[in-house]
Amino acid sequence: MLKQLVSGTALVAATLGSSLAFADDDARSSIHITANIPTQQFHVQPRNPDFGKDETMSYNTVSGTLTSLRQTFDVKNTEGSVNAYIEGGPASLYNGSDAIALTTAFNGVTLTATPQEVVDDATSTPGTQADMTIVAATPLATQNGLYTADMTVIFDAVPRVNP
């Protein structure tokens, strides 16, 4: 009986050992795929699909300023113009105690909490490109540390008004 138990245990160990050996040879790759296909009637999308995920404003030690951000967007509204605004109003870089104001403009229009036209009907109907720029105020000499900001820019399709 003991011989059978030892033989059975050895067989199980050999089987598990070979399974574990096969597991060491496995290779896995996780793949996440996203496809965003805009409508033919309305879209506002950055040319760089990674824009806004992790942007960095570098500090220039000579001038004491932060670099600005700039991104080109593809814009189209076949039914009218395009308005934009910043949800909650203009954002600031914040480190927990100090804030550095950010000025965000789209197509040359400074964005606020109030929706305003950023691309007119005639320009948006065939489709166009427009730049978004984000510029930080010059930090004070006492403002140092890691600053972060999160903001959401909302683009609205404004229907054409026929007189």
Go through each PLM region and give its residues.
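Bacterial N-terminal signal peptides that target proteins for export
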Residues: M1-T9
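Cleavable N-terminal signal peptides
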Residues: A10-L11, A21
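N-terminal signal peptide c-region/cleavage motif recognized by signal peptidases
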Residues: L16-L20
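N-terminal small/polar-rich segments of proteins
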Residues: F22-Y94, T125-P163
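Short, surface-exposed beta-strand/strand-loop-strand elements in extracellular ectodomains
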Residues: N95-V109
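An anionic, turn-rich surface loop/hairpin at beta-sheet edges
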Residues: A113-G127
